C-alpha cells in the first residue's frame, strides 16, 4: 500500500504518540509499504499556547494538499486532531480517499484540566473530527467501548509494543540514579498538569523520587519539590538505563489512553504502581497480573491510595514484570494497524462518512 501518515506529533517531541508512530513507520517500511509522513517539520510552526515544547504547524492546508497530491496515497492515517490532522482530513474528504484516524490522547480531559471547563464542551469537536474516518484506531478495547458510547462505534484495535532490543533488564545503572540512596521511585513522561505528578511527589514513602521528562510544569515542580531529582528528558539507552536503575515505576496519570512508558518500564523489570483507571487497568488488569490475569505473579499494584500502591509494588518480582513487559511486541501491533488500513481501503464508507459536511 501507499500509506500517508499525517501527524502534528513528531520529533523532536518526546511522547508515546511519537514513539508509537516511529516504530510503526519502521515496521511498515520493512513490510514493503511506501510510507509518506506529513509532520510539523515541513511547515513554519508556532509554540502551542501554554505548552511551548509542542510546536504547531502554521496554515498547513496548502502544503498538506501539495504533499498528498504528489504522493497519491491509497489510504491516509491521520494520527492527531491538530492543524495537520484537520488539513489531511479535508483533503481526503475532497478527493474521496479513505482515511483512518487515531484516538491517542484524551484532549477533552486535558482541555478541561487546563481551562476549568467541562470535558463535555470539547467532545463535539472530537466527534466531528473522527466521525467520517473509516476506522478510529484505539489502544484498548475499553477505550473503543467508551468512544462507541459517545457516538463513535467504528473503532479498531491498534495495541502498543516495546522495542525489545532496547527495553530489557540488565542495562548498567544510570550514574545519576545509581548514586542515590534507595529505594528509587521513577516517573517518566511529560511534566505537565494533566499527568497529575503532585499525587506521586506528595506520597510519604521512604526513598528517592526521580522524574525523567520535560514539560511546562518542570520549573515550578523543581522549585516546589527540592528533594526530588529531575533529570530532564532521556532517550534511547539512557532511558532504558533509567528504568533499570529504579525499584518502582510510578504512573500517577488518570487521563492517559494507554501509557507506553508503563510497558517500557515493565519490560526493563520494573514493577508498576498506578491508579485503577483506564490505561493502567488495560495493561495490568484489575489484579495487577496482566490482561485476563495471564501472569502467575503480580507485576503491578493498582490502588486509589497511591502510597499503598507504591509500597505494594516495591515487594513485587522484577523478573515477572520483565516477562510480561516483553509480551507487548510491535509486530502484533503493526499487524493490527496494517489490517485496519487494508479494511479501510476496501470497505464501503459508513453512513456518517457519506453525509456531506456543512461549511
Residue ranges and their predicted role:
Residues 68, 130, 241-246, 337:
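Short alpha-helical donor nucleotide-sugar binding micro-motif in glycosyltransferases
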Residues 98-100, 109-128:
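Nucleotide-sugar donor phosphate/pyrophosphate-binding loop at the beta->alpha transition
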Residues 176-210:
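Conserved donor-binding/catalytic core segment of Leloir-type glycosyltransferases
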Residues 219-238:
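Nucleotide-activated donor-binding/catalytic signature segment of Leloir-type glycosyltransferases, i.e.
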Residues 254:
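Aromatic "clamp/platform" in nucleotide-sugar-dependent glycosyltransferases that forms part
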Residues 311-349:
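A charged, aromatic-enriched C-terminal amphipathic alpha-helix characteristic of glycosyltransferases
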Amino acid at each position: 500500500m501507499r500509506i500517508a501518515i499525517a501527524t502534528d506529533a513528531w520529533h523532536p517531541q518526546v511522547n508515546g504518540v511519537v514513539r508509537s508512530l516511529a516504530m510503526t513507520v519502521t515496521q511498515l517500511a520493512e513490510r514493503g509499504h511506501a510510507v509518506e509522513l506529513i509532520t510539523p517539520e515541513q511547515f513554519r510552526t508556532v509554540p502551542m499556547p501554554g505548552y511551548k515544547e509542542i510546536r504547531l504547524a502554521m496554515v498547513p492546508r496548502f502544503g498538506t494538499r501539495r504533499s498528498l497530491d504528489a504522493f497519491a496515497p491509497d489510504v491516509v492515517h491521520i494520527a492527531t486532531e491538530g492543524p495537520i490532522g484537520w488539513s489531511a482530513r479535508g483533503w481526503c474528504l475532497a478527493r474521496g480517499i479513505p482515511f483512518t484516524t487515531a484516538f491517542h490522547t484524551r484532549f477533552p480531559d486535558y482541555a478541561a484540566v487546563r481551562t476549568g471547563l467541562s470535558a463535555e464542551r470539547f467532545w463535539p469537536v472530537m466527534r466531528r473530527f473522527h466521525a467520517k474516518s473509516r476506522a478510529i484506531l484505539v489502544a484498548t478495547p475499553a477505550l473503543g467501548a467508551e468512544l462507541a458510547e459517545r457516538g463513535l462505534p467504528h473503532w479498531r484495535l491498534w495495541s502498543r509494543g516495546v522495542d525489545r532490543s532496547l527495553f530489557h533488564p540488565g542495562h548498567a545503572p544510570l550514574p545519576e540514579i545509581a548514586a542515590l540512596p534507595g529505594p528509587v521511585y521513577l516517573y517518566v513522561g511529560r511534566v505537565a498538569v494533566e499527568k497529575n505528578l503532585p499525587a506521586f511527589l506528595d506520597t510519604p514513602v521512604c526513598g528517592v523520587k526521580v522524574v525523567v521528562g520535560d514539560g511546562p510544569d518542570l520549573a515550578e515542580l523543581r522549585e516546589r519539590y527540592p528533594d526530588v531529582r529531575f533529570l530532564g528528558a532521556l532517550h534511547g539507552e539512557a532511558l532504558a538505563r533509567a528504568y533499570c536503575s529504579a525499584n518502582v515505576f510510578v504512573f500517577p496519570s488518570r487521563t492517559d489512553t494507554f501509557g507506553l512508558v508503563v510497558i517500557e518500564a515493565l519490560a526493563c523489570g520494573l514493577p508498576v504502581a498506578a491508579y485503577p483507571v483506564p490505561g493502567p487497568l488495560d495493561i495490568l488488569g484489575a489484579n495487577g497480573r496482566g490482561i485476563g490475569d495471564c501472569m502467575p505473579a503480580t507485576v503491578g499494584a493498582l490502588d486509589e491510595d497511591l502510597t499503598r500502591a507504591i509500597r505494594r509494588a516495591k515487594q513485587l518480582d522484577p523478573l515477572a514484570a520483565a516477562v510480561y513487559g516483553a509480551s507487548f511486541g510491535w509486530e502484533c501491533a503493526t499487524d493490527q494497524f496494517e489490517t485496519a488500513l487494508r479494511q479501510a481501503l476496501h470497505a464501503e464508507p459508513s453512513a456518517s462518512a457519506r453525509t456531506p459536511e456543512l461549511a
